[in-house]
């Protein structure tokens, strides 16, 4: 690896805008092919089988902390894949994942279309927080018969990839050079690449697999792009503002001594209406309206 690679301050791949730039562009398709095969267990033979449906990053949406910067893919067999990376735990992840994966199904058909045109769908959710209590960092959910355990013929899969769990032991240690990649699965290695942020880890992975070198080069290029850096900072500011509003909302509930206030904010988060929280904080009349709406 070239010595000058270490002189670049790399942006975090756990940022949705950085992830999309590295994995979700036309020139990223060879990397994306290997990533999808390794993580989802697919068998995509060529990057030509991949069509990116939303490669453009529109700067006007980046100050909206609720907007989704996902990577949406269609394969040559018409299968649809939605990849989303989530930094914040808004306590609605399972419902959110279900909604957007179902949306992949409903958006395929138009009035008069035959149901046979419905293609397999995959929702891949990369999480920077722990969603489940056990130690497994990757799990997939499919539709099955309750009695026979027979899998539904039409592929509908929702996967959760809990990055922090996957690298909790390796990425936090300062003795990174002591671990052996030979004991790790391909999925383990991707978790390290995305979440560790350590130069030693990148070097180990690059020695093991050329795909990681290509992904590293894209990350380095993205980190040197002034326009993308500005977009990243705007995005991070929007997320910080979101965090501040949630913290303020919870303090507001405590200070007022009203359990119902905190209940309201939690309900809004669960139903993907978190953007209404700042108004609920500032406007008592609007807050009362929401109390009535939810029966709190």
What is the role of each PLM region?
Residues 1-296:
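Elongated, amphipathic alpha-helical interaction scaffolds
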């Amino acid at each position: 690896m070239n010595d000058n690679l270490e002189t670049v301050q790399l942006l975090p791949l756990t940022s949705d805008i950085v992830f999309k730039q590295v994995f979700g562009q036309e020139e990223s398709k060879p990397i994306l092919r290997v990533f999808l095969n390794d993580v989802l267990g697919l068998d995509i033979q060529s990057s030509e089988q991949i069509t990116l449906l939303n490669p453009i990053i529109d700067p006007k949406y980046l100050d909206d902390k609720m907007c989704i910067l996902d990577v949406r893919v269609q394969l040559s067999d018409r299968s649809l894949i939605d990849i989303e990376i989530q930094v914040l735990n808004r306590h609605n992840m399972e419902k959110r994942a279900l909604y957007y994966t179902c949306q992949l199904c409903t958006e395929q058909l138009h009035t008069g279309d035959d149901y046979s045109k419905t293609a397999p769908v995959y929702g891949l959710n990369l999480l920077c927080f722990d969603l489940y209590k056990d130690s497994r960092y990757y799990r997939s959910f499919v539709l099955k018969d309750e009695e026979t355990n027979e899998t539904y013929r039409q592929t509908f899969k929702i996967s959760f990839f809990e990055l922090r769990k996957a690298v909790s032991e390796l990425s936090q240690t300062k003795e990174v050079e002591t671990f052996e990649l030979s004991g790790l699965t391909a999925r383990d290695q991707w978790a390290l690449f995305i979440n560790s942020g350590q130069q030693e880890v990148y070097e180990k992975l690059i020695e093991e697999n050329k795909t990681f070198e290509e992904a590293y080069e894209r990350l380095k290029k993205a980190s040197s792009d002034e326009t993308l850096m500005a977009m990243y900072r705007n995005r991070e500011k929007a997320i910080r503002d979101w965090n501040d509003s949630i913290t303020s909302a919870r303090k507001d509930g405590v200070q007022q001594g009203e359990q119902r206030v905190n209940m309201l904010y939690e309900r809004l988060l669960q139903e993907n209406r978190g953007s209404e929280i700042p108004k609920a904080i500032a406007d008592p009349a609007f807050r009362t309206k929401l109390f009535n709406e939810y029966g709190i």
